[in-house]
Swiss-Prot record:
This is Large ribosomal subunit protein uL23. GO terms for molecular function: rRNA binding; structural constituent of ribosome. PANTHER family: 60S RIBOSOMAL PROTEIN L23A. The gene is rplW. The lineage of its organism: Bacteria, Pseudomonadati, Thermodesulfobacteriota, Desulfovibrionia, Desulfovibrionales. Keywords: Ribonucleoprotein, Ribosomal protein, RNA-binding, rRNA-binding. Pfam families: Ribosomal_L23.
Length: 96
């Protein structure tokens, strides 16, 4: 599998910002078929950093939600929390 296609986009949320500052971790949405070693290699090759560990969280699809009168389904996704080595940094939105 091509490592450039594994990482879909970074997670932009309050929790992701907090763990980035506190624990030197970065969160990404990844392909549902990706595993920990593929995510580690993809981050290391894309951003030229050293990765200590990877944790993966999967949200299953199909939960029904009401959006006013409309009932819909939520799609599933997979997130990876990547812990970077000491002194390593990935800068997404610095200076924004």
């Amino acid at each position: 599998m091509d490592y450039t296609q594994i990482l879909i986009k970074p997670v932009i949320s309050e929790k992701a910002t907090d763990i980035k500052e506190a624990a030197n971790q970065v969160a990404f949405y990844v392909l549902p078929s990706a595993n920990k070693t593929e995510v580690k290699k993809a981050v290391e090759s894309a951003f030229d950093v050293k990765v200590d560990s990877v944790r993966i969280v999967r949200k299953r699809p199909g939960l029904r939600r009401k959006f006013g009168r409309v009932v819909g389904k939520l799609s599933g996704y997979k997130k990876a929390y990547v812990k970077l080595s000491e002194g390593e940094k990935i800068e997404f939105f610095e200076g924004v």
